[in-house]
Amino acid sequence: MKVEYITDPFPYTLIDDFYDQKELDGIWQELDFYCYPEKLSPSDKTMPAMDQHGNIMKKNHGLSLDAVYRDQRILSNILSINRKILRSDTIKSHPSWFYQNLFIDLDYTLLSYYENGDYYKPHQDAGTLTILTWLYKGEEKKFSGGDFHFTDYNIDIEVKNNRMVIFPSMIWHAVDKIKMKEEDLDQGLGRWCLTQFLSSNLTR
């Protein structure tokens, strides 16, 4: 695992290879179950950000895992394995006061999947802290695009397998449009993202 704490122009954390192979196997066991169109919901059903006119800012498919499993989170490999970041000291080890003084007692996990033509326009998240983990099948991507951007700061982050980025939810961010070949569609070969939205009862 490689952790990089960035402080300028705002504090965020970039982590490569956060999950070990056993954890990845468990995550993929669940993702393989979801990689059928009928199991994922369209953009308007997955807590989308909207512009001032009420237009949805993204095109992708996804699933709110907390809504599915509710009080049975232990039945989800993903919801069990992604506790790892919350149990570790990784978040609060960032030197910024923002991370060292966080109080978090709520978290929600959204599973998102991007295929050909999918994107997420610049937006902010509700909550205090956002954690993104990107995943795709195989050693090489079967898609182009899908990179991540902090749009107000012209910061571009390449999407890599098992890469995590942690940042304040109010920071504007976006995802490039995905491009895929026809023969690679509908097989779960696109861009997967596990998003953890962290906040507290005091901010909701």
Task: Give short role names for the model-derived ranges.
Residues 1-96:
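Non-heme Fe(II)/2-oxoglutarate
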Residues 10-12, 128, 191-193:
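Short hydrophobic/aromatic beta-strand or adjacent loop that forms the aromatic wall/cage
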Residues 107, 117-118, 162:
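Tight coil/turn sites that cap or link beta-strands
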Residues 113-115, 124-141, 196-198:
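Short, conserved beta-strand element in jelly-roll/cupin
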Residues 120-125, 157-158:
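Short histidine-centered beta-strand/loop micro-motifs
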Residues 137-204:
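Catalytic core of Fe(II)/2-oxoglutarate
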